[in-house]
Amino acid sequence: MTSDKDINDKLKTSKILWYMYWGFILASIVLIIQIIHLKVFWEPRPTTEHYFRPRNRKEILKPERGAILDHNGKLIAVSTPMYNIAIDCTVMKESYARDKKEGKQKEKEWKEKACRLAQELPAVLAKDGKDAAYYRKLILDGRSQNKQYVPITKGINHNTLVKLKTLPLFNQDKNTGGLIVERMDTRQYPYKSLARSVVGYVRNNEDTGVSKRRGIESKYDQTLHGTEGLRWKRITDNKGTIQDTDSAMVAVVNGNDVRTTLDIDIQDIADRALRRQIESEMDIDGGCVIIMDVKTGAIRAMVNLNRGSNGTLDETYNLAIARAGEPGSVMKTATLMTLLEDGLIRLDDEIETNHGKMKNVKDDETIKKYERNNKTDKIPVIDGFKLSSNYVFRYLVKEHYGKKPEEYLARLYEYKLADAFDFELEGFAKATLPDTKSKTWSPTDLIQVAIGYSATETPLHIVTFYNAIANKGKMMKPYLVESIEKEGDIIERFKPEILNGAICSKATADTLLRALKTVTSEGTGTKVKNARCKVAGKTGTAWVVMDPKYTEGRGGVYKDSNGRKQYQGTFVGFFPADEPKYSAIITIWSKPTLQSFHGGTLPALAMKEIVDNTYALDCEWGEEIEKKGRIPEMEAEEIYTDNEKGSPVPSVTGYGLKDALYAIENSGYRCVYEGWGHVVRQSPKAGTPLTKGQTVKIILR
């Protein structure tokens, strides 16, 4: 039999086990609740959060800004890497201090290397103009003051960086030599300020300053900029970083390239021609040139030169689209077109000269001279046009539209002379024509518009109108951007657009061609008579409305208190006259002056130079002629190379243009190319050893 003692022991044990069982159950419940709380509800305090999270940091990946290309694929703007250099003067200093046996000797050797480095830096960094003593003091002072960051130089290219890495200390790893290299992408413009007012300017892809708010760099900023990427780096125990593979990564998307309609060779020709005519004439305040492809409306050149306070001519303001004013006699072609289209006149019709007199307007001295020279009291319309007679066109408009001015003005609106084009660049000035329904309308406005007053036009409006005449009446919309591209592949293409299918009949266009050819052969535009191909065009001169503070008390708006006037002189036309390829306008503006400037002088001379050199540039117009236009290249210091004599040519087959250029120039060679797209052939072949500076040719399709 079981004794009472055994029974009591069993009961006691059972009771203990029962308590233990429920104790474990309760502990498990508490533990589960705590785990759920920690996982779902609990958040660490901000002050202690870093103790509970992995040590990592976010790194923003910057995109590479897309390039801006000309019509033929030449780089107008491109982002390239540049480097800032510094030195960590504390490297190995603590380690040497702890080394009781050899520490002092090693520290002495480090300083000796620093002195040799200082001795060689002036030759490599000659552009900084510092001597060896400067660098020696800079580095040794940094060492004694325990400075971890001592700037050495800024904005060097890859070639200079390679040379620096061969110098004492800098030829060691960064933990022993202290070299700090900071890469930055900078915007390079191989053609310098050429087309600056069209292309725009940025320092780099992060530039958000005022300088960027113009040109293609501004208008297409989002396209060029690209999209930032993101990755996480984990901090290691030795304060280094490694890729955190547990965290999400957002890939960087580099910017797209923008291919413009510009032809940089023609741009250079136009720039030099305009400069040559106005550079030495200090009374000229500025000028512009637009060259347009007749069939498409593509702008091949747009030059804008403004005279600064120091007298130099710079591309600071887009006069071609942003300056609207009374155009002068170039408007007579629109008047002549209207009269011809309405069947009211023929070029050989004659009108009474009447000594150039009309009521309420100044006598026309041109007519008086014509009467004396020709012993006549009549003048054919074509002679009035080639001599740019104000009387003839005032008379014709008053005679035929005096009682119905709205019909004449309606025609001008059809010619898009008051339209706001949907143009790629910002800052397009408003063109205006008078309105017969306006309270300010006066009958005088009719005869003034006929000769280019009482209306405001930009040079782009005028050349677009003349381009339509060259195109047999079809008016094309002017445009500046041809396509958006990615590594040579076209993402979006912008095709030519028609503004007006027929502003006039082909017969009228042919008649106007005859009249415009007469201007350049016998009339006010004879400065272009001996150009290398026939030019059809018209001159125009207008007084510029002056600031009221200069004209106060004079009773007019065109003359200041000293009798000075401001002039706008224009030559506009197309060439070759019989088979037009390009239309062009050259406009200059003067300061207040006692001289007079006309469209048949400086603008016409600039036009002749443009025609001659563009003719030489284009073999399709005749025999092959050596190209006269200077094509600027990047300075040698901007070609990045990491090789010495005998380095092999890199393989770039399949590359886009930008990557191919970078790879070849980064290897120390010059690059020339044909076509666009991707590289299909290169010469010499990949792997061929060349001497630094030799040329590699690539073909793209």
Predicted regions and their residues:
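Beta-lactam-recognizing serine transpeptidase/beta-lactamase-like catalytic domain environment
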Residues: 2-4, 77, 236-249, 262, ...
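Periplasmic/cell-envelope proteins involved in peptidoglycan metabolism and beta-lactam response
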Residues: 1-312, 407-414, 529-531, 589, ...
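Extracytoplasmic
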Residues: 61-64, 71, 78-84, 147, ...
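Ligand-recognition elements built from short beta-strands and adjacent flexible loops
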Residues: 532, 586-590, 595-601, 606-701
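Residue-level detector of short coil/turn "hinge" positions at structural boundaries
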Residues: 132, 171, 346-347, 419, ...
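Preference for bulky hydrophobic residues occupying beta-strand positions
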Residues: 85-87, 200, 260, 323, ...
